């Protein structure tokens, strides 16, 4: 493997840090090389995705499912979920982004804390523990905060889904009624415009899809017309995908993270037992049900996959109507990748190259994030594809 293909490891075992503002794990954000040349918007966005920003972000998230340990800002008018890193060379002053003290021409506006966070259910559960604001106007929730694959030998090495449960920042299971109550308040008080519902994987044949369907129905009764994306593993019974559509979901994410089976076995040992062929079956059926460009999957840059093969896999996904949401691997506190493996974020040159090439493929296919009705790819804040035009 070349240097671009190998996950970047820390050369020394860093001392653990419990500082609340060291959001990227011990020194992780400060470890990737800072690229200070060039003026392209994409290059700057890549740098920020890896280096983070020194900023007070009222809307932030630690641990949980998916990319986290970040703060939410509007960066040049686009939503961005950025590592909050006190060692970053990037800082915000008077609403402008500075690199080593120099204004680089981008407006930055931290997303304001939503009003619905101040409310609680009748039985005393904070709305913030039920669903979170992502970006300026997206409501997100993990409807089941546990995963059947969370034993250490099975767990995805980048995942912290149960860490937020352990630190009491969420609850294990969100009921349809709770989600409907929170969504109604978030729409009324804070103007949310779409919702994302993901779930830890359950042992049932539906892998949690049917609970998602119940939650979608309840939310749409409370907030008619709200665009909703659902996310789950490929269900053994693919009929569950139609049930999600019938419940009112407009788009779906079925996330594989890597198309390289060796990488999958190394990074996602439990999920890797679901074959890539099973993912293709689920994706193809989901495209039939939800439509082209309404089905997406995460592809993580920085797990060690050959970059040319990653782009080729993205091209195959695009050809079959699936949006490959390319995002950088982000070291998170409490994950095996950070605490045991000491893996660093990818090199900026790798993230830029892959994102630029995948964006070109998406643009050529007419599959843009703006064409997605709801979801992570529609938001785009965790990656740089929107900055690249896709």
Regions found by a protein language model. Name each.
Residues 77-157, 161-172, 189, 373-382, ...:
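N-terminal [4Fe-4S]-dependent radical SAM core
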Residues 138, 160-179, 186-240, 244-245, ...:
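Core AdoMet radical
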Residues 236-246, 301-319:
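Catalytic cores of alpha/beta
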Residues 1-99, 285, 289, 308-390:
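Auxiliary Fe-S-binding modules of radical SAM enzymes
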Residues 240, 263-264, 306, 335-337:
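Short Asp/Glu-rich motifs
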Residues 143-147, 201-203, 232-236, 258-260, ...:
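Active-site-proximal loop/turn and secondary-structure-junction residues that shape catalytic pockets
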Residues 220-225, 289-292, 365-367:
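Short helix-capping segments at alpha-helix termini
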Residues 227-235, 283-308, 327-331:
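Conserved strand-turn element in the central/C-terminal portion of the radical SAM core barrel
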């Amino acid at each position: 493997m070349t240097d671009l293909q190998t996950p970047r490891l820390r050369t020394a075992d860093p001392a653990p840090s419990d500082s609340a503002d060291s959001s990227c794990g011990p020194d992780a954000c400060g470890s990737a090389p800072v690229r200070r040349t060039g003026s392209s918007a994409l290059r700057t966005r890549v740098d920020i995705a890896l280096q983070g920003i020194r900023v007070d972000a009222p809307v932030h998230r630690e641990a949980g499912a998916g990319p986290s340990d970040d703060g939410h800002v509007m960066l040049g008018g686009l939503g961005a979920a950025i590592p909050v890193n006190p060692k970053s060379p990037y800082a915000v002053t008077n609403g402008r982004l500075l690199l080593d003290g120099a204004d680089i021409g981008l407006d930055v506006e931290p997303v304001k804390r939503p009003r619905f966070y101040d409310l609680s259910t009748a039985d005393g559960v904070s709305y913030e523990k039920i669903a979170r604001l992502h970006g300026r106007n997206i409501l997100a929730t993990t409807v089941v905060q546990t995963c059947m694959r969370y034993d250490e030998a099975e767990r995805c090495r980048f995942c912290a889904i149960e860490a937020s449960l352990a630190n009491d920042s969420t609850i294990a299971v969100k009921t349809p009624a709770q989600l409907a109550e929170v969504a109604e308040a978030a729409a009324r008080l804070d103007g949310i415009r779409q919702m994302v519902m993901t779930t830890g994987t359950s042992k049932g044949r539906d892998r949690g899809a049917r609970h998602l369907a119940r939650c979608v129905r309840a939310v749409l009764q409370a907030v008619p017309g709200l665009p909703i994306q659902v996310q789950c593993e490929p269900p053994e019974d693919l009929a569950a995908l139609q049930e999600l559509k019938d419940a009112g979901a407009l788009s779906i994410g079925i996330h594989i993270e890597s198309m390289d089976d060796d990488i999958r076995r190394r990074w996602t040992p439990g999920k890797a037992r679901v074959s890539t062929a099973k993912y293709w079956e689920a994706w193809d059926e989901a495209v039939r049900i939800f439509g082209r460009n309404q089905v997406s999957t995460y592809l993580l840059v920085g797990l060690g996959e050959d970059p040319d093969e990653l782009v080729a896999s993205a091209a195959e996904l695009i050809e079959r109507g699936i949006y490959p949401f390319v995002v950088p691997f982000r070291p998170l506190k409490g994950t095996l990748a950070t605490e045991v493996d000491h893996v660093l974020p990818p090199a900026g040159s790798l993230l830029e190259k892959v994102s630029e090439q995948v964006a070109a493929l998406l643009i050529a296919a007419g599959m843009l994030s703006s064409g997605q009705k709801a979801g992570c790819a529609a938001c785009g804040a965790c990656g740089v594809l929107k900055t690249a035009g896709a």
